[in-house]
């Protein structure tokens, strides 16, 4: 990430310490925690002592740095999740891993066309949506947008009568339209009407 920010490994270790000390999420209490990582932000530069993988010179430097940083952040998240699994309250806990935007941003077009990145780097802007300890085990391969995450989580939490159900559609809804609007107002997917597109773009803004 950018300079002078707490690394994800240190960040999650500090979060774990606060839970262990009872400063946050005490046993027997319900809690909502939102933990925001930063190491995986451009320009994707990690100190040498934190780099656990390396790539040949065939891989563009920016692409290699991105994957090295992704490895670091993934490991930090993984260690924290494994810790959460040891807690008594884990059985009633939903862990959601997502992002506010896709990773490569302005680097994507360049890497898509590079000899080392072509065929590896997608020209699509993907953002992860991973639910750990979900009451429903599934993999969703169709198109969905960030707007669809909130109503999906309401479904998983069985909050179908919640006072605000969001602007998107739950992926558990068999009638969900398989499309999404990107940050550049580009539309991905199919099976939607002009009215659906207009609504999604308005909701994005």
Identify the residue ranges that each predicted region occupies.
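Solvent-exposed soluble domains appended to multi-pass membrane proteins
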Residues: 1-205
């Amino acid at each position: 990430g950018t300079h002078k920010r707490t690394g994800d490994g240190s960040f999650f270790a500090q979060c774990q310490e606060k839970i262990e000390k009872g400063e946050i999420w005490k046993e027997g209490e319900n809690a909502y925690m939102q933990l925001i990582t930063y190491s995986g932000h451009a320009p994707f530069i990690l100190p040498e002592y934190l780099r656990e993988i390396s790539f040949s010179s065939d891989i563009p430097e920016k692409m290699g740095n991105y994957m090295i940083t992704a490895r670091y952040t993934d490991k930090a998240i993984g260690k924290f999740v494994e810790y959460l699994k040891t807690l008594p309250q884990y059985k009633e806990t939903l862990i959601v891993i997502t992002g506010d935007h896709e990773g490569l941003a302005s680097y994507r077009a360049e890497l898509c066309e590079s000899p080392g990145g072509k065929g590896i780097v997608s020209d699509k802007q993907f953002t992860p949506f991973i639910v750990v300890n979900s009451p429903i085990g599934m993999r969703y391969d169709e198109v969905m947008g960030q707007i669809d995450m909130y109503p999906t989580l309401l479904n998983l939490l069985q909050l179908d009568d919640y006072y605000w159900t969001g602007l998107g559609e739950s992926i558990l809804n068999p009638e969900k339209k398989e499309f999404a609007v990107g940050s550049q107002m580009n539309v991905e997917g199919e099976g939607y009407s002009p009215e659906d597109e207009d609504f999604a773009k308005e909701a994005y803004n």
